[in-house]
Amino acid sequence: MLLKIKRVPTVVSNYQKDETVEEGGCGRNCLSKCCINGARLPLYTCKNLDKSVGENTESPVTFLESLVIGEWEDRFQRGLFRYDVTACETKVIPGKYGFIAQLNEGRHLKKRPTEFRVDKVLQPFDGNKFNFTKVGQEELLFQFKASTNDDDSEIQFLASMPLDADNSPSVVAINVSPIEYGHVLLIPRVLDCLPQRIDHKSLLLALQMAAEADNPYFRLGYNSLGAFATINHLHFQAYYLAMQFPIEKASSLKITTTNNGVKISKLLNYPVRGLLVEGGNTIKDLADTVSDASVCLQNNNIPFNILISDSGKRIFLLPQCYAEKQALGEVSSTLLDTQVNPAVWEMSGHMVLKRKEDYEGASEEKAWRLLAEVSLSEERFREVNTMIFDAIGFSSHEEEEEEELEEQNSMNGGSFTIVHCPSVKEEAVSN
């Protein structure tokens, strides 16, 4: 059953206020030096998670349902969002894959415009442009960090702790232009003003948050520059949606398993070509493998998206080329007219549509066509995979494996074994 909350009037968010500086602070109660002195937030310290990401442990439900959702609803009641996302229509598109469509006209009309080049994945942080130090402190929910004590097996929650400017905290904030219920941002080391680029510590923190939430319906996503990130300040997005994403149901073919137990597979029969990375002896093993691959993509100016799924147990790494095709005039006017920017949620099968006509006419064929335009070609995907496997220190024998499979396919009457990896129980999907 989907959660429902009361609709309230929307007021201007601090994201939208002007930036006129006033004596004694800028007047916006922001995170910059002008206002941060004396700022306090709750602090959530999760237990030490240096364990196998496949290990089942009991996590407290208060993290997601009481803290994230409770604080998010509080900000909703205070009118800090640009529109009421709970009033947006959502449906599952009929068909084999179960693409999810949402009509979100407010996000199109009121979302902050992109303020950087879309043809470069790595760009320096620019403090003159919008960044998260300019948000109002009321949009922040809490500080989040992982324990560094190997013996810590319990969470620690402090209701009010100073924001330590000398040791830049990681914070969770509302997304004032939400896509779904409980849509938040994880902003690693917010005061360090890091540009939107993956690093090992930040990706590990995102996996720790997913593991701590311990709910398959709470997912984190990352968009690089050039893959429809709109703010060049390091952040991950997360929200709660109580249904399975199409990408989570996709079949996969194992390419290799690393020495530390991380399994890397490629997606099959899905419109976007991508990699599924899972397992590992510890959560850090998984984070390091995906970080190495992501850094490789960044350094080679290849835009990409990341979906952290199944409570941090599975990560989908999805290189894309839609912005490049747009710039080259290779995208059809029909797709351009929809004004859909295929970021991580759309790549995963949650289609955020901005026009009622597109929502009413949504079909599996149209969703597939859009995502197929986003995907790298098979040839380019092979090239990118070679780069990735070189970066993580492994050779991809994908071509040889495929030739063997084709041979087995012809010998066995046209069948071979692939891996089907649903992330949540089927009975839960039907709700």
From Swiss-Prot:
Key words of the record: Ascorbate biosynthesis, Cytoplasm, Guanine-nucleotide releasing factor, Hydrolase, Nucleotide-binding, Nucleotidyltransferase, Nucleus, Transferase
Reported consequences of knocking out the gene: No visible phenotype and slightly decreased ascorbate levels; due to the partial redundancy with VTC2. Vtc2 and vtc5 double mutants show growth arrest immediately upon germination and are not viable.
UniProt feature, compositional bias: Acidic residues: 398-407
Classification via InterPro entries: GDPGP (IPR026506)
Family under the similarity heading: Belongs to the GDPGP1 family.
Known EC number: 2.7.7.69
Regions annotated as coiled coil: none
Induction: By jasmonate, ozone and high light. Circadian-regulation, with a peak in expression at the beginning of the light cycle.
Protein's gene: VTC5
Protein name listed in UniProt: GDP-L-galactose phosphorylase 2
Tissue expression pattern: Expressed in leaves, stems, roots, flowers and siliques.
Organism per entry: Arabidopsis thaliana
GO CC annotation: cytoplasm; nucleus
Pathway(s) this gene product operates in, as recorded in its UniProt entry: Cofactor biosynthesis; L-ascorbate biosynthesis via GDP-alpha-D-mannose pathway; L-ascorbate from GDP-alpha-D-mannose: step 2/5
Source domain of life: Eukaryota
